[in-house]
Amino acid sequence: MAVRSRPQLAFQTEKENGIGITAFNETAKLYANVVEALDAQRLRIFDSVAGSLKTEYILEKEKVISCIAWEQKPLYASEQITTDISGSGEILVLGTNSGEILIYSEHLGSLTRTYSFGILQKIIGAHVLANDGFAIDITGKVVCFSVNTGEVRTSFTVPSSSREFSGLYLSTVFKNLALASSHNIHIVDLNHRNPIDSLTTHTSMINSVVFQYLKDENKFYFGVSANQDRFINLYSKELDGTGEFPTNTVKNVGALVCENEVKMLSIAYEIENPETGVLAALTNDGTIEMFENPWLSKLRQNGTNASSLSHRRKLLTSHSTLKICFCRSRGDPPIVLESIAFESTDSLTVVWKESTRTVFETVPWRILSSQATNGLIELVRSKTRLTSKNKTVSNVYDESNATISSGVMQKDLRKTEEIGSAEAMEGEEQEPSLAERLQNLTKLDQQAQALSTQISASTSLSTVLTQALKTNDQSLLESCFNNNNVETIDTTIRRLDPSLAPILLDKLAEKLALRPMRADVLMVWIRCTLITHGGHLVLVDDLKHKLANLHSILEDRASKYSSMLALQGKLDLVLSQIAFRKAGGSKDNAEDEEPISIYYEGYEESMDEASSTGDEGYSSDDSVDNEMYSDEENSSKGAFPDEENENRELSEDYSGDESLENSESE
């Protein structure tokens, strides 16, 4: 038999009310969710049967998804979507904070259409039924458009006293019938662009709506749940069978009560036998409460009139017939589930997160109902190895979540100074002898050799690093970070548990901020960690906050790179010029140059005597200049014979004086 499953479609982001942006398709075989990455959101689609990731798509940085929904198959005749949009597979509709609507093809693995109408704000509900597309923004503005052409068919605003809306729900049985939700429920005829009925259902924002059509009664039933509310209000609306929707025909037929606040609803029923419907409510604590035949109240079942109003309310209120929860061991709190959806009226698919893994399980709830104890089924599911490690890591990481923006942490400096001063005072009070100092030095050398031998092995280094990260042992971390062997660092990081990568990066950021001069070694650790465990890091929740310290430090260092590079260029230029001069780069030119002046001892006195003899027109400066020429040049100019004789006598006197000095020295 064909089964219609109506899984809940999420409309709020996780930051708003704790509900993630998730959606099951109608068969509950495909599951989509949106996760936060470093700088952009990621759309991930899973095969819930195999429990594996099927496709992943990285959205543009400026696009922030606010709601998602799978394509629904209407029961009425309609035009189909072209294959260039759907890729002969199912499509996913995504609404953004900027008012855009994106169409993602699961078969093609890419965005095939983007619609921007310019009149919508933040999209809180978007649906596609064949070629008919529908969207509503947070202010209640509704747009109906053609998926194939993108043409707007109609647009209007739902009148409401509420400032914000929470979703839009389309009927697959009746064309142009929709329910818009805020604090109230507005039944809207999309063809006439006006609300048929408006109901005040809850005091808080509605988070889930499910509905079912009973052909025998010609009634349209729907159930409504809201945030911070344990009650699920049930309503019915009579139809006239002419294709029109009469007004003022909505009645309250009862309420379903859960033990905790309702997170989402899901309903399944057989088309050929719609009275065998079953409704599942997921509560905030992770418990699933099952309601069989939810529209059949005790008052209708007994067929009697209540004697009082309180008795009537009691008959209209129903509690769950079965509760299902997943736990680590008997009696433990339930595991918080992310979403649920009916695969059939007898089986339910649930999904929850374990660290970065998404876990799926199909629960044959009708078969397990015979094993219930006091109406409760506890399914024990132990943690995986990765999850158990993540739990320990999370505790260690939370103990050292100090934010480092830049510079040196003054707190650590004060601690270091206090320790140093305390040790100094203690040393002054009790100073060891020379023999004790020698013994201590010998022990320290032996310990250093043993530690270096241990650290040199990559396996031992990986073990030491894991232990240091789990116990937050600073001395062990320091011994690991002192290793600057690239091969050892790379092998150690490869053998490190991926769940410890965020903690390692945080510790490296602290070391880098405290000791910037160790950047050469620490950057090798950071680079190897990002390369080896980058695939795991992008799947870590709230990664931006966890790596904020590292990002701030690296950004601060990168901002100084251009100025330091310019300074390095100037220093290289100056140093190269100095080296060139020291190496005697101008020796060749120096050999060719003539001396500026030549000085002869006793020459000036003889020139004074010559000038006093009355040689007019010839100065001592001219004699010095003429002396700098060779004998050939002087003869060509008609040199003075008296001066030549005087020069010859001076040279003889000079040589005689020199020989006299040599003899005296001997």
UniProtKB/Swiss-Prot annotation:
Annotated localization: Nucleus, Nucleolus
Region: Disordered; residue ranges are 603-666
Which of UniProt's keywords are assigned here? Answer: Nucleus, Repeat, Ribonucleoprotein, Ribosome biogenesis, rRNA processing, Transcription, WD repeat
Q: Where is the composition biased (Acidic residues)?
A: 618-633, 641-666
| Primary residence | nucleus
InterPro entries linked to this entry: SSU_processome_Utp12 (IPR007148), U3_snoRNA-assoc_WDR (IPR052414), WD40/YVTN_repeat-like_dom_sf (IPR015943), WD40_repeat_dom_sf (IPR036322)
Instruction: List the GO terms this entry assigns under cellular component, sorted alphabetically.
Output: cytosol; nucleolus; nucleus; small-subunit processome; t-UTP complex
Subunit organization = Component of the ribosomal small subunit (SSU) processome.
Q: What is this protein called?
A: U3 small nucleolar RNA-associated protein 5
